[in-house]
Curated annotation (Swiss-Prot):
Tree of life domain: Bacteria
Biological role: Specifically methylates the guanine in position 1207 of 16S rRNA in the 30S particle.
Enzyme class: transferase
Organism: Pseudomonas putida (strain GB-1)
Subunit field text: Monomer.
Protein name from the UniProt record: Ribosomal RNA small subunit methyltransferase C
Chief location category: cytoplasm
Family label: Belongs to the methyltransferase superfamily. RsmC family.
Subcellular location: Cytoplasm
EC id: 2.1.1.172
Stored CDD domains: AdoMet_MTases
Keywords on record: Cytoplasm, Methyltransferase, rRNA processing, S-adenosyl-L-methionine, Transferase
Length: 332
């Protein structure tokens, strides 16, 4: 079980009425707290929770429209996302209890200061390198619309400016990361057809593809509900259309693709996790049509080339700069 869940269960007597667990991990916490419902924005966690606790987990960027007497937030990595989530929960809990649980190395002590906006926070427990905090909502805030927290910026690209809309918690929130910047220079000569932006984030790559290859169908896939929402906003901001879907890894992607384009993720919360990226490489042949291409950017220290060669039989390094490599391979 997640150590944060274990700390929460040490205080299980506090949770007598309907409880909302925001950012719930995919463990047995709902089994131990039968009065609880989960709110998650991670498609993989949602699938696992729903398979075990059908109807008790809700995947969205806003709290589910359910009655609850108290709520627990599992602290996310992003401080901006934590602020949005705390505000969204506190707006529904006037005079009631809001709890915050997280790892010490994830910044729980600093994040607990954000509770001061709603009342007087106090630390209830500390164990397993985690802490549990509580605040009674004396001053319930107005819920902030998610779009009001969006960061909007413009990229000067070869074929004109691209408007980008980023949301809290999305990778490289509010700015263009170096890996994607390098990959944007290598979008020439791509095979038309059905293109996939894997791990789409704020939708920079997918929107650029759709504008540069308007006759192609573009699908954008991400595990994170906030990234899915941001990508849809980015498409709309540029007058573009595309399919933006949520799913946990390449297994959720269509088949018969002409292209897989990606700056693949390798973080889950504060932890490093290469599984989604390695599965993408190993299973790429299942999702590409014959003659289809995979083009991606990755940190130079990651040994992705042997995995790509093992899956597709070939791989070339198109470019290397700023600690990143561009890989290209074709499904023969």
């Amino acid at each position: 079980m997640d150590p944060r869940s274990e700390v929460l269960l040490r205080q299980a007597e506090l949770f007598q009425g309907p409880l909302l667990i925001a950012g719930a991990p995919a463990d047995d916490l709902l089994g131990q707290l039968p009065q609880a419902q989960a709110w998650t924005w991670h498609a993989g966690d949602q699938a696992m929770l729903d398979s075990r606790f059908a109807g008790r987990s809700h995947y969205a960027v806003e709290p589910p429209d359910l009655p609850f007497d108290s709520a627990v937030l599992f602290l996310p990595k992003s401080r901006e996302l934590a602020a949005y989530l705390l505000n969204a929960l506190a707006s529904r809990l006037a005079g009631r209890e809001l709890y915050l649980v997280g790892e010490k190395r994830g910044g729980i002590e600093g994040a607990a200061k954000q509770l001061q906006a709603f009342g007087k926070p106090r630390k209830l427990d500390s164990a397993r390198h985690c802490q549990l905090w509580q605040v009674t909502i004396d001053q319930a805030p107005q819920a902030k619309p998610l779009e009001s927290l969006a960061e909007r910026f413009e990229l000067a690209l070869e074929d004109g400016p691209l408007q980008v809309v980023s949301l809290p918690g999305v990778f490289s929130h509010g700015r263009l990361d170096r890996g994607t910047a390098l990959l944007l220079k290598h979008l020439d000569g791509l095979p038309d057809g059905h293109m996939l932006d894997f791990g789409c984030g704020a939708g920079v790559l997918g929107a650029t593809l759709k504008r540069r290859y308007p006759q192609s169908r573009v699908t954008m896939l991400d595990v994170d509900a906030f990234a899915v929402a941001a990508s849809r906003l980015t498409l709309a901001a540029n007058g573009l259309e595309g399919d933006v879907i949520s799913g946990d890894g390449i297994d959720a992607a269509p088949t018969e693709l002409s292209l897989i384009l990606s700056n693949p993720p390798f973080h889950t919360g504060v932890h490093t996790n290469y599984q989604a990226s390695e599965n993408l490489l190993k299973k790429s042949a299942v999702h590409l049509r014959k003659g289809g291409e995979m083009r991606l950017v990755a940190n130079s220290f990651l040994r992705y080339q042997p995995l790509i060669e093992g899956a597709l039989g070939n791989c070339q390094v198109r470019d290397e700069a700023d600690g990143f490599r561009i890989y290209q391979a074709t499904h023969g």
